[in-house]
A protein has these predicted regions:
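Divalent-cation
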Residues: 1-127
């Protein structure tokens, strides 16, 4: 697995859809994940710590997990097929399926790493 960091969230020039750009922490490859406007807003909110007076659904998810004595340790992008990325949150060592946008927003808010399977980065990562 390789650790990633968020480079930017922007609109795709051709389609006008939000796209998240992630980059290897130790390397040059980047990963582009297209997503809904709501998914992009969740990530932007986490990056900007927006609206701290009103917890986001991602903050509520982290609080709920903590309330049962568990914690999120990593967001993992583990697969890619036909343009669709598959992700999960690792909660107390157990995988919990999640949309990539949600997994990344939770990771940003929880301060945990975002990681990707080497095979995914090999298949769709670009320099």
């Amino acid at each position: 697995m390789r650790e990633l960091t968020v480079v930017e969230v922007r609109l795709d020039d051709e389609e006008g859809s939000p796209v998240l750009i992630l980059k290897e922490v130790e390397g040059e490859r980047q990963l582009a994940i297209w997503m809904s406007a709501a998914g992009a807003a969740g990530i932007l909110g986490a990056l900007q710590d927006a609206d701290a007076d009103h917890p986001s659904s991602h903050e509520r998810m982290i609080a709920l997990i903590a309330s049962v004595g568990a914690e999120v340790s990593v967001a993992h992008i583990g697969g890619h097929q036909e343009g669709v990325f598959y992700a999960e949150l690792i909660v107390d060592g157990r995988p919990v399926n999640a949309r990539p946008s949600d997994a990344i927003a939770v990771a940003l808010r929880a301060g945990v790493p975002i990681k990707v399977a080497e095979a995914v980065l090999d298949a769709v990562g670009v320099v």
